[in-house]
C-alpha cells in the first residue's frame, strides 16, 4: 500500500491524472482552454484518418475504434510507470480484444456481401492449377490475422519493458564500479524510455488501424 515516488512526485497521482489527459472533457462553452482544444484536435484527426477510406457503413465503428485506441494508450502509458503492471503484455488480453473484433469484421462481410468476402480468398487472374493452393493460403492468412494483431502488441511492449529492465539493472550495478559508464548507461536508459513512450502510443494506433483495414475489406 506504499505509494512510490519518482522525482518527488507520488506515482499514484500521476496514474490518476494521466487518463484525464487522454480522454476528452465535455464543455458547453464556445471557447475552451488549450488542453481541451488539443484533446479534441487529436481525437478528430485520429477518427478522420481511420474513417477516411471507409464508406458510411463503416462509420458506425467510429466510437468503438476511438475508444479502443484511447483504452490501449492508457494501459500502455500507465504500464510504463514504475511498480505497475502492463496488462497489454499479456497475450490473453490482446487476443481477447483482437479475436472478437476481427470476427465481427468477417461476419459483417459474410452477411452484407458474401460474394465479395469470399472473393478475397482467390485473387483475380489466378491460373487454374494454383486455385486450390491459393485458396488454402488465403484462408490461413485470414485466420492468422487476429493472432498477428495480438502477438504484435504483446511482443513490442514486452521487448521494450525487458530492455528497460536490463539497462536499468546494468546502470545500478555499474554505478559503484564504473560511475562514468553508469551515467552513460543512464542516458541510454532515458532515451530508451522516450522511445518506449512513442512505441506505446504507436502500437495502440497500429492495432486499431489494422482493424480498420480489415473492416474496409468487409464493409
UniProtKB/Swiss-Prot annotation:
Annotated compartments: Mitochondrion inner membrane
Membrane-traversing stretches: 4-24, 61-81, 90-110, 124-144, 172-192, 194-214
Pfam families: ATP-synt_A (PF00119)
One Gene Ontology term, aspect cellular component: mitochondrial inner membrane
Subunit annotation: Component of the ATP synthase complex composed at least of ATP5F1A/subunit alpha, ATP5F1B/subunit beta, ATP5MC1/subunit c (homooctomer), MT-ATP6/subunit a, MT-ATP8/subunit 8, ATP5ME/subunit e, ATP5MF/subunit f, ATP5MG/subunit g, ATP5MK/subunit k, ATP5MJ/subunit j, ATP5F1C/subunit gamma, ATP5F1D/subunit delta, ATP5F1E/subunit epsilon, ATP5PF/subunit F6, ATP5PB/subunit b, ATP5PD/subunit d, ATP5PO/subunit OSCP.
Function statement: Subunit a, of the mitochondrial membrane ATP synthase complex (F(1)F(0) ATP synthase or Complex V) that produces ATP from ADP in the presence of a proton gradient across the membrane which is generated by electron transport complexes of the respiratory chain. ATP synthase complex consist of a soluble F(1) head domain - the catalytic core - and a membrane F(1) domain - the membrane proton channel. These two domains are linked by a central stalk rotating inside the F(1) region and a stationary peripheral stalk.
Protein name as annotated: ATP synthase F(0) complex subunit a
Gene name of this polypeptide: mt-atp6
Amino acid at each position: 500500500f506504499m505509494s512510490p515516488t519518482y522525482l518527488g512526485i507520488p506515482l499514484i497521482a500521476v496514474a490518476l491524472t494521466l487518463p484525464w489527459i487522454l480522454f476528452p472533457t465535455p464543455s458547453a462553452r464556445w471557447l475552451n482552454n488549450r488542453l481541451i482544444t488539443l484533446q479534441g484536435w487529436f481525437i478528430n484527426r485520429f477518427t478522420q484518418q481511420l474513417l477516411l477510406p471507409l464508406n458510411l457503413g463503416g462509420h458506425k465503428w467510429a466510437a468503438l475504434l476511438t475508444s479502443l485506441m484511447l483504452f490501449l494508450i492508457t494501459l500502455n502509458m500507465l504500464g510504463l510507470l514504475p511498480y505497475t503492471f502492463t496488462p497489454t503484455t499479456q497475450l490473453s488480453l490482446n487476443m481477447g480484444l483482437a479475436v472478437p473484433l476481427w470476427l465481427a469484421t468477417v461476419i459483417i462481410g459474410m452477411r452484407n456481401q458474401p460474394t465479395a468476402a469470399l472473393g478475397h480468398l482467390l485473387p483475380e487472374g489466378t491460373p487454374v492449377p494454383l486455385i486450390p493452393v491459393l485458396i488454402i493460403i488465403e484462408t490461413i492468412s485470414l485466420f492468422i490475422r487476429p493472432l498477428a494483431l495480438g502477438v504484435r502488441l504483446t511482443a513490442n511492449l514486452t521487448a521494450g519493458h525487458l530492455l528497460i529492465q536490463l539497462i536499468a539493472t546494468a546502470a545500478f550495478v555499474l554505478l559503484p564500479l564504473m560511475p562514468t559508464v553508469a551515467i552513460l548507461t543512464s542516458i541510454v536508459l532515458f532515451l530508451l524510455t522516450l522511445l518506449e513512450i512513442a512505441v506505446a502510443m504507436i502500437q495502440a494506433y497500429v492495432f486499431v488501424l489494422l482493424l480498420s483495414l480489415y473492416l474496409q475489406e468487409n464493409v
